[in-house]
Amino acid sequence: MKKIFKIATLALMMPAMATFVSCDDAFEPAIENIKDGVEDFVMYPSWVEAYIAHAYISNPLDELSFNDMATDDAVSNEPGNSYRSMATGSWSASNNPMDRWRDLRGSIVYLNGALELIPQSPWASIESTQEMFVERFSGEVYGLRALFMLHLLKNHAGMANGQLLGVPIVLDPETPKSEFNLPRNTFKECYDQLIKDADKAIEMLTEEAVDLKDNEAHLIPAKWAAKGVEVGEYNRVWGAHIVNRMNARVAKAIKAQ
């Protein structure tokens, strides 16, 4: 009898206990979890940097292309080889082993969005450090955009009606209301935009990422030294921890191609 009484008591207490331990946002997200528009988004610099990180992940130089089998130079013995399937009738818009458009064009979308968000995001409390972060991240974006434009032209430029065409040039962030049915710009226009972006990257970025020693303040570029930037803050932005990111030397190599 006592056991039955205990069970009944627990059954009556459970709903009351649930009211004390349940989350008030179990069914409606808490306000702080809802990011409404650019104003909320830019307050989280790591989220803004994720736009740039997406482009680094899609880096067209990060993988080897074994496309010899897409020509008569080689043939695969593997039945499921994508190039072999392509040659035997499986090539379509939804199954294209040669596709580079999606990743290259998609990364430019992210880079354009980053350019809008970078100046609005609080990267540092010190004004000069904030300026350095904005310049570095913007320079990376311009350099990456030049790189992706280069590979878009390599893969998708061509002749049409006797004219050498490139790809549509899109420099602004896109929304669901943007015009996506854009004509291709000429190859020359795309080339000029590539050079323009590469030049901006060269202007904004350093040749290489190195940590300055405490007695090397004289190596801080005059632009930042004039703003009172010290070695510690300079290394925070331009130090060796960013060695694998876009720099002026890489931008020059892109421009040279």
Where are these regions (language model features)?
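Membrane-proximal, proline-rich intrinsically disordered regions
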Residues: 22-76, 81
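Aromatic-residue-lined binding/catalytic grooves and analogous aromatic/hydrophobic interfacial grooves
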Residues: 23-26, 162, 195-217, 221-224, ...
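Well-ordered alpha-helical segments within folded domains of soluble proteins
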Residues: 107-115, 169-170, 249-254
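Short, flexible, mixed-charge acidic loops at enzyme active sites
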Residues: 159-173, 218-220
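Conserved, well-structured interaction surfaces
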Residues: 81-158, 176-192, 199-206
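Bacterial Sec-dependent N-terminal signal peptides
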Residues: 1-33
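Active-site beta-strand/loop architecture of penicillin-binding DD-peptidases
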Residues: 42, 88-91, 242
